[in-house]
Amino acid sequence: MKKLFRATALCGACLWAMGSSPALAQTLPEQHDLKILTYNIRHGQGLDGRTDYVRIGSILKKSGADVVAVQEVDSVTNRSGGQDVLRRVADEALMYPAFARSMSFDGGAYGVGLLAKEKPLSVKRVPLPGAEEPRVLLVAEFRDYCVACTHLSLTPADQWASVPILKQVAAAYDKPFFLAGDWNAQPTDSTLKLIQRDFKLLNNTKKLTFPADEPDQTIDYVALWRPTARRVVARGSRVISEEKASDHRPVEVTVRFLQPNENVFYAPPYLQNPGNGGVTVMCQTRVIAHTWVEYGTDTLHLQRAQTLVGGQAACHDIEHKIRLNGLQDGQTYYYRVCAREIADYQSYSKTFGDTVRSRFYRFKLPAADQTDFKVMVMNDLHLVSRDEEAMARIAREEKPDFICFNGDCLPEPSTREEAMYNINRLAKRFDGAQVPLFFIRGNHEIRNAYSAGMPSLFDYPGGHSYGAFSWGDTRFVILDCGEDKPDDHWVYYGLNDFRGFREEQLAFLQQEFKEKAFRRASRRVLLCHIPLWGNEDKYNPCQDMWGGALQRAPFDVELSAHTHRFVYHPAGTIGNPFPVCVGGGPGAATYMLLQKQGKKLHLTVKNLQGEVLRQVDL
């Protein structure tokens, strides 16, 4: 790939493909935590006698709260020097302000406010009963939730009369509704008991909030409307130890929103590493989850498998790799993947979402003495969507037993999100939930920021990007050729050591040739991205290092890629001890069908127009 015209064509193809693909824009939704704070600021005057709006805003900014309910707020009063107090605080806290007047006061207004990092979709003011002074409820609606702020009357009768209004307002929304503020009632008062029938208190009422210097009571709260509480998990609360800025202490609550059930799975599962009486089911979730697989020879009598690490269920990440062992060769199995979002994982408590289940899929492992199979091999797709779609249509027609992507099909992953998107796109297109997939690493999979992380999204035979597996009585050996330039090339910045990696594979090859599975196989196939013979680059370290061992190896064929130009080299024509078939690339894409029937092994190479480029009995 050193020729200028070829490099230019490749870059153009890759840029076209990536520009037209949503892969680069694909991001995972983070688990959605919301921090709500309520604070009666006493119009900004602290117990030290200072009226300091910047101090209040600084406290809120430092807390990291997403939404703040603020009580006792002046607006352009004489007492505030004509200042818009909430806006002054909001500017310091870097939040959007919303003010609700409860009454006119001192040349301006007095009431409650809400501050938020996110601009509300709408804001609503609702009057509440108040004998000693007018009271008000301020509601801000956001995309996923609502937050309401109030400062209830000092009079119990007014408090009780306010509760039906609070309930009516909350019931008008079909999303989580939080109520926060200074309610002028203690936890044992009848007002709190009445409110708690329909609202769930989220802060620890044993943590005292008033007065700020020496608190002896709790009158500040954050609560959640119970009918909308099902998909909200309380993750903790605290009272901030601020003794001077106001006569109340700020109360902070953190909650987490569970993902909708339909969003828990990132994509359907995909099968990896079939063999030795087992197969690996891989999937990713959009949130931290506990996953397991239910499987059996029918859909009614199911076993359960999960991944354990030192006796613990592996549920600390969004990547899931579950091995199904003890399977009977030649038997059809059905399986589904199950997951529960973990909303809160503490030492002595855990909170889960609903159990979500995929649909049932099926697969069958080959018997050890099985002679017949069909495998489809493609290479150098380079994210070209039209080629992927065409190959997927062909795969649906050909119905191969398994599929090999022979390198540069998942090039240059920059992030885990991008790698996941591209892998799952191919897996979905090629029915990877029911057809085992082998992803062979090409030189372009080695490049970019997440290249060293992407292997965790696969389960390779033997645990390496090289290895061997048997399909019936045929042995397949996979080699990872590494990069196509020397390790000391400037573009690698001293981060590569593929010479050592190739030496490791030489030792693997020497051991593989001694293995019973290799020696007793009726046929043997070598898969590698860069051709060991027929590589058009002058730099060919794999042939230099492995060629001697492979000269004596009884392979029936080598299937390779990399050059983007289809060519077939019969054994002995270029020093190759066995036939070498090299697949085409973007603009001249090809696919290979390797089919075995009885003792006969047949290779067919076609382009995407369906033209047969080569047919050969091996």
Label each region the model flagged.
Residues 3-8, 12-15, 23-37, 228, ...:
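Acidic, histidine-bearing metal-coordination/catalytic regions of metal-dependent phosphoesterases
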Residues 33, 48-49, 72-146, 235-241, ...:
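Structured beta-strand-rich core segments of catalytic domains in phosphoester-bond hydrolases
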